[in-house]
Amino acid sequence: ARICPRILMKCKKDSDCLAECICQEHGFCG
């Protein structure tokens, strides 16, 4: 499992996100 804090963060690319979160299609990290 990826380590991804449950914080809503807007993003344009994966590097905008914390830890191992990825930028999802709806424009938020997850």
Curated annotation (Swiss-Prot):
Subcellular compartments: Secreted
Listed GO MF terms: serine-type endopeptidase inhibitor activity
InterPro entries registered for this protein in UniProt: Prot_inh_squash, Proteinase_amylase_inhib_sf
Keywords carried by this UniProt record: Disulfide bond, Knottin, Protease inhibitor, Secreted, Serine protease inhibitor
Main location: secreted
Family recorded in the similarity comment: Belongs to the protease inhibitor I7 (squash-type serine protease inhibitor) family.
Function in brief: Strongly inhibits trypsin, weakly inhibits chymotrypsin.
Written domain comment of the UniProt record: The presence of a 'disulfide through disulfide knot' structurally defines this protein as a knottin.
This protein's name: Trypsin inhibitor 7
